[in-house]
Amino acid sequence: MEILMKSGDLNKYDLVKNALVLVLAGGRGSRLHELTDKRAKPALYFGGNRRIIDFALSNCINSDLNRIGVVTQYAAHSLLLHLQTGWSFLPQERGEFVDMLPARQQIDDSTWYRGTADAVYQNMAIIKNHYRPKYILILAGDHIYKQDYSVMLMDHVNSGAKCTVGCIEVPRSEAHEFGVMAVNENLKVKAFVEKPKDPPAMVGKPDVSLASMGIYVFDADYLYKMLEQEVNTPQTSHDFGKDVLPKCLEEGALYAHPFSRSCMGRNTEGEIYWRDVGTLDSFWQSNIDLVSENPQLDIYDQSWPIRGNPIQAYPSKFFYKHSNVHPVDNSLIGGGCVITDASISNSVLFDHIKIDAFSKVDHCVVLPQVKIGKNCVLKNCIIDRECEIPDGMQIGVDMEEDKKRFRISSTGKVILVTSKMLKILEGHEIGEEGHLD
């Protein structure tokens, strides 16, 4: 099929049906510590009843990009189960799918995915011979945002680029965590450096850098060529940002797509929303932000819905027998929760949580199937799945005491509590892997 380069001649349907999306979902997220010991970062819970990967997948479906492969590797069981139960609704007879592409050591018997580029390279035979796309959209499965990818795809074809990278303006003080680029007036990338120690500023904006979002659109044939070159390059990191994009830049084939062009669901001030929830502080803050009256991220927006696992829990119920107990305030409550004479404020509670009488939960993110006993006080906490908080326990009240028992975030503000930590406090033998570091 011949795609004309004039925007008026471009047909969105033709573009999306000839595109394949690859969601890279194999990362651990080591800065989240024990939260990702048993689950990949994209499988981590978010927003009361969703997983992080649901945002990328919902963006695909809302963008009419219904040919999706999810590349998995680290601790993939919960992620694969979520994809099977929540994302198997596309009609395969129409060529639509969410396929799982786990690491299978396809190149030889000893090598798993060695980087983002290698993850795609190891699946290249399947992509070329089975999916046969004309365009390939590659994105990370561990960011929180809403974007119409079809707009980025349209811009890619319009520009004549071989590779297009999504970009966003970030504070220069934070840009060392990203690939940073400079572009000309036509958005052609003129310079690119991955995670620089001293990030360059944008022209006229000394405190702002233009950062890569880790989202790429490639002409499929061009991507195959670049990956074949990359795998045979000595001392390669097998990484798109470090290895592939600089080669695209050398060939003059790299263009940028500003996120502002395709962002969906701006807030009332017109601000765009994109978060890398890669630390305990950012994960906690991004969840807590949702409880405000007008949050930057609107999870109730039906014009751009964020789908998830359709399994329905029973309704939550609340018992308040004592008038001196302050009830639920400014909080998100999942399904199947039972709250009895407990005070909950500025918190996000996921499904199937039980909180007993006279406990206080403030500015907490509580993951599913947690039990909180009587007379507990929890402040500024992330409570991992299946924790049982004993009667009278106080967390977030005495930080020096908490440092001896739990994981404290790098800012010293957020406390992570897991079931292993609680079992150690109770004196249970849980093996060497349960020791705190």
From Swiss-Prot:
The family this protein is said to belong to: Belongs to the bacterial/plant glucose-1-phosphate adenylyltransferase family.
Pathway it works in: Glycan biosynthesis; glycogen biosynthesis
Assembly with partners or alone: Homotetramer.
Taxon lineage: Bacteria, Pseudomonadati, Pseudomonadota, Gammaproteobacteria, Pasteurellales
InterPro entries, per the entry: ADP-Glc_PPase, ADP_Glu_pyroP_CS, GlgC_bac, GlmU/GlgC-like_hexapep, NTP_transferase_dom, Nucleotide-diphossugar_trans, Trimer_LpxA-like_sf
Gene from which this protein is expressed: glgC
Highest taxon of source: Bacteria
EC number, as in UniProt: 2.7.7.27
GO biological-process terms attached to the record: glycogen biosynthetic process
PROSITE patterns hit by this protein: ADP_GLC_PYROPHOSPH_1, ADP_GLC_PYROPHOSPH_2, ADP_GLC_PYROPHOSPH_3
GO MF annotations in UniProt: ATP binding; glucose-1-phosphate adenylyltransferase activity
Reactions catalysed: alpha-D-glucose 1-phosphate + ATP + H(+) = ADP-alpha-D-glucose + diphosphate
Alphabetized Pfam families for the sequence: Hexapep_GlmU (PF24894), NTP_transferase (PF00483)
Positions contributing to alpha-D-glucose 1-phosphate binding: 113, 179, 194-195, 212
Full protein name: Glucose-1-phosphate adenylyltransferase
The protein's role, per its UniProt record: Involved in the biosynthesis of ADP-glucose, a building block required for the elongation reactions to produce glycogen. Catalyzes the reaction between ATP and alpha-D-glucose 1-phosphate (G1P) to produce pyrophosphate and ADP-Glc.
Keywords from the named record: ATP-binding, Carbohydrate metabolism, Glycogen biosynthesis, Glycogen metabolism, Nucleotide-binding, Nucleotidyltransferase, Transferase
